[in-house]
């Protein structure tokens, strides 16, 4: 029973941190004092559940990694058409960000500017893994469908992910006014026509 309560409190702390990142406070540095006040506990109580604020951010980063990576792997296992795979992976990231605005501040690095470098490195690694997966999907098209792309797969993967990252940055910059999925269908039609 005590272990369950501790898990619930940990989740409560992470949810409070995500909510703070989603609010106007998210554009400023979040201190443990502010977070403790949000949760309704002392700072000491926060540290009973997490040894540092960096570990709290790591908890949110793990959630982001697990959520996105698991779903990408499912898409790649279930879908075989290259263009559908690409569309679904890109749309997944955009929808995840739109549904989790506070976590989008972490994904763009805005919430990590005043935190430990290793946190930003971890987010960078997540996006590098996604880019690698996109590049692999693009390369597999020759094997699966017998045709390639007019542009090098590495360049194309970087451009695809860059478009997504730009949409996430715009979402954060606009204080969550401009949804990342806004106009995605038009963007995808344009891209599909170019890539054929």
Curated annotation (Swiss-Prot):
Gene name linked to the record: slmA
Residue ranges the UniProt entry marks as DNA-binding: 31-50
Protein name: Nucleoid occlusion factor SlmA
InterPro entries xref list: DNA-bd_HTH_TetR-type_CS, Homeodomain-like_sf, HTH-type_TetR-like_transc_reg, HTH_TetR, NO_SlmA, SlmA-like_C, Tet_transcr_reg_TetR-rel_C_sf
Organism of origin: Photobacterium profundum (strain SS9)
Record has Cell division as a keyword: yes
Protein function: Required for nucleoid occlusion (NO) phenomenon, which prevents Z-ring formation and cell division over the nucleoid. Acts as a DNA-associated cell division inhibitor that binds simultaneously chromosomal DNA and FtsZ, and disrupts the assembly of FtsZ polymers. SlmA-DNA-binding sequences (SBS) are dispersed on non-Ter regions of the chromosome, preventing FtsZ polymerization at these regions.
Subcellular location: Cytoplasm, Nucleoid
Coiled-coil segments: 115-142
Keywords per UniProt: Cell cycle, Cell division, Coiled coil, Cytoplasm, DNA-binding
GO function terms (MF aspect): DNA-binding transcription factor activity; transcription cis-regulatory region binding
PROSITE patterns reported in the protein's UniProt record: HTH_TETR_1, HTH_TETR_2
Family statement: Belongs to the nucleoid occlusion factor SlmA family.
GO cellular component: bacterial nucleoid; cytoplasm
Pfam families (UniProt xref): SlmA-like_C, TetR_N
One Gene Ontology term from the biological process aspect of the record: cell division
Domain (HTH tetR-type) ranges: 7-68
């Amino acid at each position: 029973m005590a272990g369950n309560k501790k898990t619930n409190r940990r989740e409560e702390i992470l949810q409070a941190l995500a909510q703070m990142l989603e609010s106007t406070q998210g554009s400023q540095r979040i201190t443990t004092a502010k977070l403790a006040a949000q949760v309704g506990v002392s700072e000491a109580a926060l540290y009973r559940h997490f040894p540092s604020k960096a570990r709290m951010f790591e908890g949110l980063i793990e959630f982001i990694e697990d959520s996105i990576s698991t779903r990408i792997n499912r898409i790649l296992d279930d879908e075989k058409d290259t263009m559908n795979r690409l569309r679904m992976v890109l749309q997944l990231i955009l929808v995840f960000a739109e549904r989790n605005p506070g976590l989008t501040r972490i994904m763009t690095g805005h919430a990590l500017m005043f935190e430990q470098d290793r946190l930003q490195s971890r987010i960078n690694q997540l996006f590098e893994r996604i880019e690698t997966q996109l590049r692999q999907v693009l390369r597999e098209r020759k094997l699966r469908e017998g045709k390639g792309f007019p542009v090098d797969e590495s360049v194309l993967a970087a451009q695809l992910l860059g478009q997504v990252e730009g949409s996430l940055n715009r979402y954060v910059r606009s204080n969550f006014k401009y949804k990342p999925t806004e106009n995605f269908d038009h963007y995808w039609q344009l891209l599909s026509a170019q890539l054929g």
